[in-house]
Amino acid sequence: MLWLDLGNTRLKYWLTDDIGQIVSHDAKQHLQAPAELLMGLIDRFERYAPDFIGISSVLGDDLNIKVSETLSRLNIPFEFVHVDANYPLMKSAYNDEQLGCDRWLQMLGAVDRTKRQCVIGCGTAVTIDLIDHAEHLGGYIFPSIYLQRESLFSGTKQITISNGTFDNVSQGLTTQDAVHRGILLSIVGAINEISTRHPNFEVIMTGGDAAIIAQHVNRPVRLRDDLLLNGLARYFDHSKQA
């Protein structure tokens, strides 16, 4: 199988064997040209000869059409994920036309009917979603730590330092530290507040910034880097069975 995740800035792919083990995986910046990037990967995909391609995409219809045209060259069946608030594996109170595909798949990859869960995606945006025994209750969306920093530096003339690390939430003694610690605290504080409101929910985090944020959260956190891939596999496995 070939699994594709077309995000806001990056294209990720996983090639898995017949028992679901990952045999090849990579992530690349697509610069809003995912079809062109895929064209350069066609030879690699052909060598593994996957029998199906499952696709998660948050891109618009125009880019998805170009992606489809490129994938058609492989002569392999492919299908895009479609968010469904009434999906049997997880019901959702959310408007499914506004629920991002990647966000939904992250939840689908984590959902457990026996548990209450708080699923946090730490990518271009930070998404926090509450799931009660496979029922999505809704959630929150924040700009990522890097988007917050970019916005602050582009909109504030007095703050011109754009480098630094997100490694502490104590008060800063320089503008650089104050900016980075304030931004990190805004995310960590929100997670801690939501966790306090929902103390019986297991906290699960995924995404590129998950490890940075998780170490400052005041609850045990389960880090999962495979949620979207697991969600893709679950979605298409269930679709085939249905």
Swiss-Prot record:
EC number(s) reported in the record: 2.7.1.33
Pfam families assigned: Pan_kinase
Keyword Coiled coil belongs to the record: no
UniProt cofactor(s): NH4(+); K(+)
Sequence positions that bind substrate: Y94, G100, C101, D102, R103, T175
UniProt entry tagged with the keyword Nucleotide-binding: yes
Active site: residue positions: D102
One GO term (biological process): coenzyme A biosynthetic process
Class of the enzyme per the UniProt entry, highest EC level: transferase
Pathway named in the protein's UniProt entry: Cofactor biosynthesis; coenzyme A biosynthesis; CoA from (R)-pantothenate: step 1/5
Entry keywords, A to Z: ATP-binding, Coenzyme A biosynthesis, Cytoplasm, Kinase, Nucleotide-binding, Potassium, Transferase
InterPro entries: ATPase_NBD, Type_III_PanK
Top-rank lineage group of the source organism: Bacteria
Cofactor binding annotation: A monovalent cation. Ammonium or potassium.
Binding of ATP, residues: D5, L6, G7, N8, T9, R10, L11, K12, T124
Gene3D superfamilies, per the entry: 3.30.420.40
This protein's GO CC annotations: cytoplasm
Localization in the cell: Cytoplasm
Reaction catalysed by this enzyme: (R)-pantothenate + ATP = (R)-4'-phosphopantothenate + ADP + H(+)
GO molecular function: ATP binding; pantothenate kinase activity
Subunit and partners: Homodimer.
Family: Belongs to the type III pantothenate kinase family.
NCBIfam families with a match to the protein in the record: baf (TIGR00671), PRK13322.1-3 (NF009858)
Cited HAMAP family: Pantothen_kinase_3
Function: Catalyzes the phosphorylation of pantothenate (Pan), the first step in CoA biosynthesis.
The name this protein goes by in its record: Type III pantothenate kinase
Phylogenetic classification of the source organism: Bacteria, Pseudomonadati, Pseudomonadota, Gammaproteobacteria, Moraxellales
Name of the encoding gene: coaX
